[in-house]
Amino acid sequence: MLGAVAHIGITVRDMEGAVHFYRDVLGLKVLGDITIEGDEADTITREKGVKLRAVYLRSEKDLKGPPVELLHFVEPAGAPGVPYPRLTNPGITELAFWVKDIEQTYTDLRARGVKFYSAPQLFELEGYGKVKAVYFWDPDGTTLELLQTVK
């Protein structure tokens, strides 16, 4: 019935700041930048007078994986606040990225001002084996995760 995941959409308050973070801090590559408005945009979003900008980014290391879709609603303006302030809330809680060296990536991102929940933690996960994981926030408070398999 369903095919592969097409993209992961994240609504942001400040597109330029979000693009800087995902492109310049995390190292994703911009694939496209579009503006959407009109009746179709109003219908699909169930809002009136929609004008939104979408920027698509993807890791150059995983050309088959789904891109990240950053959405900025120019009109109507989005609500203030942070998404899912607690991981225990229902809904999509995080976007995870595989990395080769989690400790080095953690150190590099901290040096760039990225705020983390904690240092990387080691888990035994059925189907994956040993995995190191750590959560952090993007500029809008969306939770992101780094993962590394450990032998």
Residue ranges, per PLM feature:
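Vicinal oxygen chelate
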Residues: 1, 10, 33, 68, ...
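Short, solvent-exposed beta-strand edge segments and adjacent coil->beta transition regions
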Residues: 3-7, 52, 90-94, 131
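Core segments of cupin and vicinal oxygen chelate
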Residues: 11-65, 104, 126-129, 135
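A cross-kingdom feature marking solvent-exposed beta-strand/loop segments within repeated
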Residues: 38-41, 78-81, 122
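Generic beta-structure capping elements
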Residues: 60, 71-75, 149
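Short, flexible, mixed-charge acidic loops at enzyme active sites
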Residues: 73-76, 82-83, 117
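Non-DNA-binding regulatory cores of transcription-related proteins
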Residues: 85-88
